[in-house]
C-alpha cells in the first residue's frame, strides 16, 4: 500500500512540488504578516491596570518674564509649590471631579517619557530592568489613577502612607520577578550605582500595569518624592 502511495506521489512529483512550494509560501506569508498582527492585537487587549476611562490630564505652564501678569516675587520655590498645590485643589473642587493628583516629572503612565533603572532583590545577584515613576505622597496618587490593589495595602493606603527616604512601591509582576512572590511587603530592593549601594524597602504592591497602551505590562517601581525641586 505504501509503495503504491509512493509511486503515485513520485509520478506526480512536479505537480506535488508546486503544491508544496505554494504551501511553504503561504506559511511564510502567514508567519510574517499574521503573527505580528495577532501579537499586537493580544497586547492591546491586555487591561491597562488602571482606570484610564475617567482620567483627564491637565498640563500647566509658567508665564515668561515678558508676559502680561508675570509676578517676579512669586517665583521663589515655596510660592511656586504652594501655587501648584492650590491649582490641584482648585481642579479637585470642580463639579464632577472625584479626585485629582499632581504628576511631576516626565515619566508616568502613558507619558511620552521613560525612566529605567536596575534593581536587585536583597541577597540576589540577578538585576531586573525596571521602569521608575515618581509620585507625591498624600495626594491621592494611587486611588486617583485607579490602580488595582495588590497584596497588602490598598491604593488609598499607599497614597497616604508616611514614606521614609528610599521606600518604594512595586507592581506585582516586579515583585514576582524580584522575590518570586506577589507579597513583597517588608522585603528590600538594592540599587547599585557607581559603587554606591542603596537599600530600598518595599512598602506595598499594586496590580500589574501597562506603562504604554501598546506595551505588555512591565515591572514598575514607584518612588515617593519627599521634596520638590523647582529649579
PLM regions and their residue ranges:
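Residue-level marker of alpha-helix boundaries and capping positions
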Residues: 27, 78, 128-130
Amino acid at each position: 500500500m505504501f509503495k503504491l502511495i509512493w509511486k503515485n506521489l513520485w509520478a506526480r512529483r512536479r505537480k506535488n512540488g508546486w503544491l508544496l512550494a505554494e504551501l511553504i509560501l503561504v506559511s511564510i506569508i502567514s508567519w510574517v504578516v499574521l503573527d505580528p498582527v495577532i501579537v499586537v492585537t493580544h497586547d492591546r487587549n491586555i487591561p491597562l491596570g488602571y482606570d484610564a476611562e475617567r482620567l483627564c490630564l491637565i498640563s500647566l505652564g509658567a508665564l515668561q518674564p515678558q508676559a502680561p501678569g508675570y509676578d517676579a516675587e512669586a517665583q521663589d520655590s515655596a510660592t511656586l509649590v504652594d501655587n501648584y498645590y492650590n491649582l490641584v485643589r482648585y481642579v479637585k473642587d470642580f463639579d464632577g471631579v472625584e479626585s485629582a493628583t499632581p504628576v511631576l516629572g516626565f515619566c508616568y503612565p502613558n507619558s511620552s517619557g521613560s525612566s529605567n533603572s536596575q534593581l536587585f532583590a536583597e541577597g540576589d545577584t540577578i538585576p531586573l530592568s525596571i521602569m521608575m515613576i515618581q509620585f507625591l505622597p498624600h495626594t491621592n496618587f494611587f486611588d486617583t489613577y485607579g490602580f488595582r490593589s495588590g497584596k497588602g495595602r490598598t491604593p488609598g493606603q499607599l497614597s497616604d502612607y508616611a514614606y521614609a527616604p528610599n521606600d518604594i512601591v512595586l507592581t506585582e509582576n516586579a515583585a514576582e520577578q524580584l522575590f518570586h512572590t506577589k507579597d513583597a511587603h517588608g522585603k528590600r530592593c538594592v540599587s547599585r550605582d557607581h559603587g554606591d549601594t542603596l537599600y530600598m524597602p518595599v512598602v506595598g504592591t499594586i496590580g500589574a500595569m501597562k506603562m504604554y497602551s501598546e506595551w505588555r505590562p512591565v515591572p514598575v517601581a514607584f518612588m515617593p518624592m519627599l521634596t520638590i525641586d523647582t529649579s
